[in-house]
A protein has these predicted regions:
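Class I SAM-dependent methyltransferase SAM/SAH-binding core
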Residues: 44, 50-97
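A short SAM/SAH-binding and catalytic strip from SAM-dependent methyltransferases
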Residues: 106-127
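A short acidic, Gly/Pro-enriched loop at the edge of an enzyme's catalytic core
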Residues: 96-108
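A short glycine-rich, Lys/Arg-flanked "PGG" loop and its adjoining helix->strand segment in the class I
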Residues: 127-142
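Conserved Class I S-adenosyl-L-methionine
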Residues: 50, 180-231
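Conserved class I S-adenosyl-L-methionine
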Residues: 1-39, 145-172
Length: 231
């Protein structure tokens, strides 16, 4: 599974963006982020991917920079930026060692990114994720906001961590690092069932495709957790 996601992020970024474009059909994510993040802030987005958070936040930011490890994701991000009225900068790098000075940003975000380290480094995930969290804390100015978004399952009518490993990571964020969790419905709204399968199967797999068909889901249920804290 680790190689599955790495391969997508390194070579199928445009397909990935086609998948996520119809996410958050009811706008819960956008409204929650606007509540947590005041306008006029300098924002650093880690694991920025194809631009999911910059597309939501950059227009109201004083400055926004997105960082990602994968060049293909950054190229698709730049393509999406060219279609947007907002602007943000892009940097290739590792979120465990950030090329920014201390207290550089008022807001540091990481969307659907840090959790991969739980699977990619099963034997020392706490060490690896701690490196990211310490860097987020270093970059965030005093009184700033740190926001982490992760999956709470796709294809279920109730929210829950999709794996035991992620459940451990989420609980650890709260108990050891003092983050507070909010749970949001962020369903995908596709035109029809066939489109839902066509756009999502490469990422979520054949079992999910069959579940979509069996339930007639043009609207694919999804849940997202938002963990936040003050710097």
């Amino acid at each position: 599974m680790a190689d599955h996601f790495r391969n997508i992020y390194s070579s199928r970024a445009s397909d990935y963006h086609r998948l996520i474009a119809p996410e958050d059909a009811d706008g819960h994510l956008a409204r929650t982020l606007r509540r947590l993040i005041p306008p006029g802030q300098r924002i650093l987005d880690l694991g920025t991917g194809t631009g999911r958070l910059p597309l939501l936040l950059a227009r109201d930011a004083k400055q926004m920079v997105g960082l990602d490890l994968h060049g293909d994701m950054l190229r698709e991000n730049a393509a999406q930026r060219s279609l947007s009225i907002a602007h943000w900068s892009l940097v290739q790098g590792d979120m465990r060692a950030l090329p920014f000075p201390t207290a550089w940003a008022q807001v540091v975000t990481a969307g659907w990114a840090i959790g991969h380290l739980r699977g990619w480094h099963p034997d020392d995930w706490q060490t690896q994720i701690s490196r990211v969290l310490k860097e987020m804390r270093r970059i965030a100015a005093p009184g700033g906001v740190i926001v982490i978004l992760e999956t709470l399952t796709t294809g279920s009518l109730t929210p829950a961590p999709p794996t035991e490993g992620l459940a451990q990571y989420y609980a650890w964020l709260e108990s050891e690092w003092g983050f507070t969790r909010e749970t949001l419905s962020t369903d995908y709204q596709f035109a029809n069932v066939d489109e839902a399968v066509e756009r999502s199967e490469f990422f979520f797999g054949a079992e999910m495709a069959e579940k979509i068909r069996a339930n007639g889901w043009a609207r694919l249920p999804e849940w997202t957790g938002i963990w936040s804290k003050r710097a």
